[in-house]
Each structure stands twice: as structure tokens, then as C-alpha cells.
Swiss-Prot record:
Acidic residues compositional bias, start-end: 395-404
The protein's name: Putative clathrin assembly protein At2g25430
Stretches with biased composition (Gly residues): 197-214
Modified residues (Phosphoserine): S221
GO cellular component, one term: vacuole
Biased amino acid composition, Pro residues: 410-425
Organism, as annotated: Arabidopsis thaliana (Mouse-ear cress)
UniProt-listed CDD domains: ANTH_N_AP180_plant
Domain of life: Eukaryota
Compositional bias annotation for Low complexity: 160-171
Amino acid sequence: MAPSIRKAIGAVKDQTSIGIAKVASNMAPDLEVAIVKATSHDDDPASEKYIREILNLTSLSRGYILACVTSVSRRLSKTRDWVVALKALMLVHRLLNEGDPIFQEEILYSTRRGTRMLNMSDFRDEAHSSSWDHSAFVRTYAGYLDQRLELALFERKSGVSVNSGGNSSHHSNNDDRYGRGRDDFRSPPPRSYDYENGGGGGSDFRGDNNGYGGVPKRSRSYGDMTEMGGGGGGGGRDEKKVVTPLREMTPERIFGKMGHLQRLLDRFLSLRPTGLAKNSRMILIALYPVVRESFKLYADICEVLAVLLDKFFDMEYSDCVKAFDAYASAAKQIDELIAFYNWCKETGVARSSEYPEVQRITSKLLETLEEFVRDRAKRGKSPERKEIEAPPPVVEEEEPEPDMNEIKALPPPENYTPPPPPEPEPQPEKPQFTEDLVNLREDEVTADDQGNKFALALFAGPPGNNGKWEAFSSNGVTSAWQNPAAEPGKADWELALVETTSNLEKQTAALGGGFDNLLLNGMYDQGMVRQHVSTSQLTGGSASSVALPLPGKTNNQVLALPAPDGTVEKVNQDPFAASLTIPPPSYVQMAEMEKKQYLLSQEQQLWQQYQRDGMRGQASLAKMNTGPVPAYGMPPVNGMGPPPTGYYYNNPY
């Protein structure tokens, strides 16, 4: 259908509706005519003159309000033109913001009676081609107004005041472990608009005085409801219902309030035009007051979020879960709201300076709340608060009455100086005396103790030093024979006496006689050296040989006991010399076997000679001087010659 023909048909319909309203209206024909003119079929916004006329008529009596609700409801239910439906919804929106509060109540009462005036879920435009996007906007706009009435009804029943919650930063004394004290979700400062239509300064979206800004604004929030007296007049308008501050509400009521606000925000976000509706002037004009209301809606949501955050750490587990869900859903809605505002700024809906600074809910805050919910689930119940016991009242003691007969000491004179305390007398230092080397007076030693000390001296371990004296260090020398200062012909006690005179304070207070382990070891070593000297002269056989040379003789041999084992150590001998107790390698054993075979044969010859001539007296000893010549490299077996080097010995002669 051509636009001109459509406009003509629309004008005819409007004139017909006006004529029917003038003739058939029984209650308020002027009101119905004004409603028809305000919701005409032309594409221009409604004139401010008709809007002001409707506002004035509805403010006269409750009957006009009821007639207005009936007329607008009938207009919305019969029309199939999105322009007429959109103008009717804009009129309802204007009456909700600036009209009498009874108009809102009448809409709610009509809803209870079954007349769902704002239920336009089945609306479809049939007058325009390609008007699907416009019809979708009309349906969502009606849903937004309907949800706003639901929120108003909830606040009327519960008596909620969103902005009466006080400052959200009173939690300075609470635990800040999970980020308490955040002021990210406080309400912005109060603005000059409060869910009303139009802007300040008397200019509308078009910029002239014929739009929505010419009527003085009446600041009204959702909770600014009035109680009606029950009569048909407005006698009860001045009686306001007592509101409850948001912070004093129970968690159930706070969650109910938050649910209504979030559902209303969802309806607002769904108002974003799509398709051809983005370029429609009528839709942008209808969107302007809704965007202005969303600023206050966002502030109310931030206020509720701040209250939930303050009470979050003191709630029960079920309430914590609900609060966390509210934060999670609000985070997604705020992201969509930022995108919607950006589109509105680009399109030119309202000025950029009017938009509030929207703050996102950070993922860190959500993670913190989720962690707290998990911890609360593990505990099973909320922690019990410990009541702080009030300190007992201080009982003021009554001052005793002075006794006139009591004897009191006189106060000291003003110039009185107390005498200084006496200085402590210095204690004389005890002189340190050097004890004698042989001191038998300090500790009496019994025969048993002396015997025990002699027994302990035979062990290899050092004796325990419990006295003042300490044994002088031997520097690893365990024997007097290993001391290089010990020369042949110098007694051991002289060396010990020289060393003790220089280190007298380090000596150990021992029993009389000065028993020393080093001297004891030297005595045992002297016996070992003598044994070595005696055995070194008898090197004519192996360890098992009994053919030994006779002392003082060079050719005579006699039988003797076997040589000592390998435990006897030589003094100043090479530490890497072969040991007799450990078998040598195989290549060494071969040479040893040859030597032993030679000695065995020699020993057998000696036994044979002894059997033949040994029993006949001294005459047979002369025959023993002659013997076989030893092989080259074999040691002499007659015991003659100089003694081996490295031994300390005493000449017995």
C-alpha cells in the first residue's frame, strides 16, 4: 500500500474514532477525544497539547482515571498498526511518570480483574510492509512497562526504599580478607531525573517545546507510592507509606528486590532496535525516556549489589549462593548494558554527558566470592558470632572521711635531698696459685682408685678429664719411640719433664707419681724393640723354621722356638712394607716358595746331622761349622754381620 493512501486511511479512521467518542462516550468524551488525537496514525510524535490535556483531566477525579485506563486498553487491543500501539504505550509511560499515582493503581486493579492492558505478546502489524522489527519493539516496550508495574507492586507491598540504605562504606571494622570495603557498586550521585520523562531545560529529542519536556517534572521513584484512603477522591494522597531502608531488610526481601531489578534490566536490554527499526524516528523518540530511566535503574542495582557484598560474609550458605548467582548474572547484564549505551551514543539517543560511568564486575571479585562460597560449603554452616561481653561497670569507691584524731606523718621538706645509696664494696679477687706437678694434698687417692686408674691406663681410649688440668697434646704421637726428640741414650722422663715445665697449666691433676700414658706406651715399645733386636739376629729361617744360629757363634746352629708373628712392628719402617699376616700376591709367593724349599732342605740336613752326631758330645759341634754355600742373593743364616738398620736396641754385653 502506498504511503499516501495509508495516511489517508489512517486519517479517516482517526476522524471516525473521534466522532464515535463524542457521541457514544458516557463518562468523559473530551478525555477519549484527546486520547484518540494523541494516538493518531501519522508518523509524527504526539503533540504536547493533547498530552497535557490528558494529564489535567486525569488529575480531577478517579472516574477520569478509570475512563482513561479503559480507553487506552481498548485502543491497544483493537489496533493493528505499530505506530498507534507505540503512541499508546508512550502515553501510558508518560502517565506513569507524571500522572496521578491512582493511574498506576487502576492499571494494577484492571490486571487483577483480568484485563491485561500491557500484555501485547501477540501483537502483529498489518498496516505496513516490512514492519516485523517495529512490531518486535512494540512487544518488548509493552513488556518493559509491565515489568515496571510488577516492581512497583512489589515495592508497595514490602515498603522498600532503595536510596535509604545509607552509605555502603560502613564496614571499616569488618574483615577485608575477601575484598570487603569495595566501593565499585555504589550508587552514583543523585541526578535531576528519577524515572520521569523528558529532560531538563524544556527541550525534547526533536529540540522544540512541543515534545515531552515542557511539563514540569515530578521526581518520583519506584517506592514513592501513596496510600489511598478508600474513597473516590484524593484525600489520602498525602499519607505516604513508611519505607524500610535497604540495609535493614531481610536477605529474602533483598533478593526479591534484586530479582525484580534484574528482570527489568533484561526487558530494557531487549529494547535495543534491530533491522529497520534502528532508523525509525518514532522508535528513537520512544527509546529516549527509557534510556534515561535506565540510568536510575543501574544506580539501584549498584546499591543492592553493594548491600549484598557487605552482608555476603555474614550470610548463611544458601543466601551466599543466591548472592553469588546475583553477582554472576549482574556481571553479564552490565557487559550488555555497556554495549547498549555505546550504541545509543553512536546513534544520538541522549547526550553523551548524561550517561553514567558503568563499572564492570571484575572476574577477580567473582573468583573471590566463589572461593568463599566453597569454603562455606566445606564448613557446613556459618560461623557463630561471638558476643563481646561488655566490661563490668566501674564502681567508684567512696572517699573515706578523714579522722580528726588520726596521726599523720608530716610531709618532707621541699629542699630535702635523700642520701645517695652506699656504694658496694669491691670484692677482692682470689689469687691464682700454680699447683705443683706432684701434689698429694688436694685429693686423697685411695689404693682402689689408684688401681682403677692403672687399669684404665691400659685401654687405648683417653681418660676423662674432669679436673682443672688438661693433658698436653702429643700431636698424634702415641709412643715415646716415635718422638724425634727421643734419642738413644736420653731417658723418657727427662723429655716429659721438659715439656711439662712449659705447659704446666695444661697438666691434668693426677695421682702422685704423675702416671702418663705416653710413658707407659714407651715402656711397652721398649720391650717390643728388644724383641725385634733379638729376632733380627735370628733371621736364618722362616716363621716356622727351627734352625736358628747360636748367639755369639757364626757357624754353629741350634734349635729354638719359632719366630714371632707379624704383629710386631718395626720402628721407622716403611708403612707400605708387606705384612706377614696378609698373604702376598701369587708372583711374590713363588719367590717365597723357592726360599722356603731351600730352607726346608737345609733344615732336613741339620736334623740328619743332629741325629748322627748331635748325641755324641761337644766334639761333633766342630763338624757343624762346615755347610753348603748359599746361593747368590740369599741372606746369611749364621746371624753374623751388622744388625739390620732401623732398630733401637741395647747391647747385652
